[in-house]
């Protein structure tokens, strides 16, 4: 039976007083002696001649030894596997959003035309207007995935982006694997609310990539990350919040080299202008955000403390701030990487409080920050810990097979939950009998842009090209049943595609409009 041996360096500042744990069977005693020599060498500051890969949450053996293959299936890997299988399953079964579909249409048009689309060509209300398409690269990439494998590949690609971001979160976390697992599992509940396949998935990956580069002080890679990010999603502005926090910590710790942080920041700013928008990027994106906050768009609302899922965000945020305040006197002795994590999490927290879509990025940073703040030291005394590698392997394999089969079954049967065919074929036929121009809601416009490409829509999920007055009139019509006649007359509307629950349906029916299609969800009407 293997014995759990704990080696804790006595005050070695160079290894941050962490306890290093290795499971050492008797036949690897010689290798374990190398571990002890390695630690002593590190503490003394002398040159370490024996290569060793050791970590607080990894099993360590000498490279010259031949470990039992079963030792690979540790409890740590067991928990990590279950966690990431849950992420893959949740992402893989996320419903397709209307935004994803108009983005696929834009990606297809740019793929075919070989130029970036910066004017509206999808609506009859803003046709030809300027459209600050700051997500053009993500749209093209998603369409490339669609060409390769259809909507399943689009979903799986977004899954890879999101899982990659959480893998960095897991990599930056410290402490016992049970604690890391617990914090991550709690964070996944509110964070998973916005995992649909769309450009936001790029931001989830790039947020953690930026944090990782700041923590590891690999600053030269940051401009490259920002030039790609700025062409994929407007969430790059959140990246600049993180960048300012991380470089601010570096400047405070090494004020004499402030100019290095300034150069890195300048490089990232210049990288963000390397987009089709050019310098107007710095005016168009803030204007877009200001317009968004004036509309009741769900993902831009504040997190609701009464919602059982979003409540966990508040719990983690309060725990993080409270722990940070309680340990404020000891922060001067914290490692630079830990201080960077704390600063980045604090910087992103206000954005998460203001908009629920930023809850995920905050939690991805807060998890490793919390594990660092509440790091549990292991006792020096050796204790027994039972490893069950065969059981771990069996459960991991069973879970992986179950997740794979579930996703394959869902994709093969195109279950309604996926929303891959949200517009019924009969409704599309009815639309063909309907004269221009069309009226539809903001929420469903993306569906029509993709599934009815020959029709110009009234609105879709791109709020940028549309006049604010048009958006506000539409909101009144669909929330309080405002008068539709002025808008219909102004835009020459003679056809409507609406959900059956829309208050406009009742008004049009009362006014004598003819029903061309009707089911429990959708209605097509004409005058």
Model-derived features: where do they sit?
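Membrane-interface transmembrane helices that cradle and orient dolichyl/undecaprenyl
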Residues: 207-220, 322-330
């Amino acid at each position: 039976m293997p014995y759990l041996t704990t080696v804790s360096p006595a005050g070695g500042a160079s290894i941050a007083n962490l306890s290093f744990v290795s499971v050492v069977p008797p036949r690897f005693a010689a290798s374990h002696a190398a571990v002890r020599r390695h630690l002593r060498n590190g503490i003394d500051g002398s040159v370490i001649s024996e290569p060793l890969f050791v970590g607080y949450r990894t099993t360590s053996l000498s490279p010259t030894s031949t470990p039992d293959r079963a030792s690979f299936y540790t409890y740590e890997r067991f928990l990590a596997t279950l966690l990431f299988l849950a992420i893959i399953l949740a992402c893989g079964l996320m419903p397709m959003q209307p935004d994803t579909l108009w983005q696929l249409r834009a990606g297809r048009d740019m793929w075919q035309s070989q130029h970036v689309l910066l004017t509206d060509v999808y609506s009859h209300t803003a046709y030809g207007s300027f459209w600050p398409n700051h997500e053009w690269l993500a749209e093209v990439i998603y369409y490339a995935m669609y060409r390769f494998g259809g909507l399943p590949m689009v979903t799986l690609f977004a899954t890879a982006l999101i899982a990659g971001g959480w893998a960095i979160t897991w990599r930056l976390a410290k402490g016992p694997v049970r604690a890391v697992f617990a914090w991550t599992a709690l964070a996944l509940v509110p964070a998973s609310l916005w995992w649909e396949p769309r450009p936001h998935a790029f931001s989830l990956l790039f947020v953690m990539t930026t944090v990782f580069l700041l923590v590891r002080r690999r600053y030269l890679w940051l401009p490259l990350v920002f030039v790609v990010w700025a062409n994929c999603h407007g969430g790059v502005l959140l990246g600049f919040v993180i960048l300012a926090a991380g470089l601010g910590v570096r400047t405070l710790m090494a004020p004499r080299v402030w100019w290095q942080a300034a150069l890195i920041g300048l490089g990232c700013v210049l990288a963000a202008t390397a987009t089709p928008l050019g310098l107007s990027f710095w005016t168009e994106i803030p204007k877009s955000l200001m317009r968004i906050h004036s509309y009741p768009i769900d993902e831009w609302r504040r997190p609701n403390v009464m919602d059982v899922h979003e409540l966990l965000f508040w719990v983690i945020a309060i725990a993080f701030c409270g722990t940070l305040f309680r340990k404020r006197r000891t922060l001067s002795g914290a490692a630079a990487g830990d201080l960077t994590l704390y600063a980045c999490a604090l910087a992103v927290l206000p954005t998460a409080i203001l908009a629920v879509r930023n809850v995920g990025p905050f939690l991805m940073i807060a998890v490793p920050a919390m594990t660092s703040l509440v790091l549990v030291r292991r006792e020096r005394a050796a204790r027994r810990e039972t490893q069950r590698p065969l059981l771990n392997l069996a459960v991991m394999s069973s879970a992986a097979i179950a997740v794979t089969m579930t996703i394959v079954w869902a994709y093969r049967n195109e279950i309604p939950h996926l929303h891959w065919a949200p517009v019924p074929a009969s409704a599309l036929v009815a639309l063909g009998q309907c004269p221009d121009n069309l009226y539809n809601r903001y929420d469903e416009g993306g569906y029509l842009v993709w599934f009815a490409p020959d029709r110009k829509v009234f609105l879709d999920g791109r709020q940028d090209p549309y006049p604010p007055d048009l958006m506000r009139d539409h909101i009144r019509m669909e929330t309080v049943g405002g008068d539709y006649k002025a808008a219909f007359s102004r835009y020459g509307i003679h056809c409507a595609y609406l959900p059956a629950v829309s208050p406009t349906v009742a008004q049009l029916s009362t006014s004598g409009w003819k029903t061309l299609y009707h089911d429990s969800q959708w209605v097509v009407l004409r005058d």
